[in-house]
């Protein structure tokens, strides 16, 4: 199937937009570049500004064996939770060497099969720009990354590095779409949810609510919550997020207050359900 490959080359805002008229129940299709047509002055869009990191590293042992390290989460500077392949052939204490003089020591295998990996030097996020690869989502069926992947699978407003997969709902926005939203009087607010490896986990349960989601780190600024609770300039204005799949509803039912979290940085395993 060539559709996933073709989709990656499509203009961002040419993606299809599913439109539901909540008053009539009628559904239709449009393109995302026209999303401003379905919003009203004073509406506020909450957007995830996470930035995808080059989480996949290819290295080798001193014996010459190839090793792949897929970074998941940084615990302390230089110490990461990661997937190591082939795990059975990488014993605890094994040194893995990467390009640019970067090395890492593999720790014990954790109960879930993951490993702690300590890097030298410890400034891993800076190192990734030169030695890492961006992880391709499973629906992109090719073995190796292409030069445009890091741009294509990054939102135009990506800011805080830490995700191993793009927040796909945000990929449809362009500067032109934002210009149209600005002209319409639609506000924007940003929060951060670092999309983790669990997003690739298939649903293996009959009951959706029984599907367990890996915790993901998020940062919810107080100013974002305040933006959602600020009095709207006109009746009926709403606060809405970029949905998991392109969708838009109208008319909206009213501004939705969002509460700031007690800590600036924490994690969640909450999942949206229909």
Go through the PLM ranges and name each one:
Residues 1-274:
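Surface-exposed, charge/polar-rich loops and edge strands
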